[in-house]
A protein has these predicted regions:
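Short active-site oxyanion
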Residues: 24-25, 48-50, 80-83
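Active-site-proximal beta-strand/loop segments in catalytic clefts of secreted hydrolases
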Residues: 28-30, 53-56, 87, 110-112
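Local sequence-structure signature of Cys/Sec-based thiol-disulfide redox active-site neighborhoods
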Residues: 20-46
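Bacterial N-terminal signal peptides
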Residues: 2-15
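Stable alpha-helical elements in mature extracytoplasmic
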Residues: 32, 39, 54-57, 89-93
C-alpha cells in the first residue's frame, strides 16, 4: 500500500498538464473489471492518455484520495490533481479541467448506471455527475446514457 500511496502522491504532484494536447490520467482498478476497461477505451477515444494500474486494495486508494463512500464505483482515476470516480463521461472530465471549480477535489458518477460510458445497456438510465470536496457534493451535470440533459 505504501508503494501505491507514493505513486498516487507523485502522480498528483506533477505539474498540471491542462495545456498538454493529451490529458493524462492514472486509473486504479481491479484486474477482473471489464467495464473499467470499456470506460478507459471511452476516455482514450476522447483524447485522454490513460495509464491503468490493477490494484488489490481499491478501497484503500479511494480512502487515501478522499472519495466519499456514497460516491464509490468500480474504478478511481486521478488527473491534474482531481479525482475521477466511476463512469464519468469524458466531456465532464474536460469541463472539470477547464473550469477548475474552487474547493472541488473530484468528480463522480456513483454506482454503475446503465448506459453510462463503460456500461453499455439496451435502456440507458438517468444519472447525475457530481462534484465533491470538503465534505460536500453538488450536481455538475445530468445524463441519460452518454447524452447530457442538464
Amino acid at each position: 500500500m505504501r508503494l501505491v500511496a507514493a505513486a498516487i502522491i507523485a502522480f498528483m504532484a506533477t505539474a498540471p498538464n491542462a495545456l498538454a494536447e493529451t490529458p493524462r490520467m492514472q486509473v486504479f482498478k481491479d484486474a477482473a473489471c471489464g467495464c473499467c476497461d470499456i470506460w478507459i477505451d471511452h476516455m482514450v477515444e476522447h483524447g485522454f492518455e490513460v495509464v491503468a494500474q490493477n490494484v488489490w486494495n481499491l478501497n484503500g486508494i479511494k480512502d487515501l484520495l478522499g472519495v466519499p463512500v456514497r460516491m464509490s464505483s468500480c474504478h478511481t482515476a486521478v488527473i491534474d490533481g482531481f479525482v475521477v470516480e466511476g463512469h464519468v463521461p469524458a466531456a465532464e472530465v474536460r469541463r472539470l479541467l477547464d473550469e477548475r471549480p474552487a474547493g472541488v477535489a473530484g468528480i463522480a458518477v456513483p454506482g454503475m448506471p446503465d448506459g453510462s460510458p463503460g456500461m453499455p445497456a439496451a435502456v440507458a438510465e438517468r444519472y447525475d455527475v457530481l462534484i465533491f470536496g470538503a465534505g460536500a457534493s453538488a450536481p455538475f451535470a445530468t445524463y441519460v446514457g452518454e447524452q447530457r440533459v442538464e
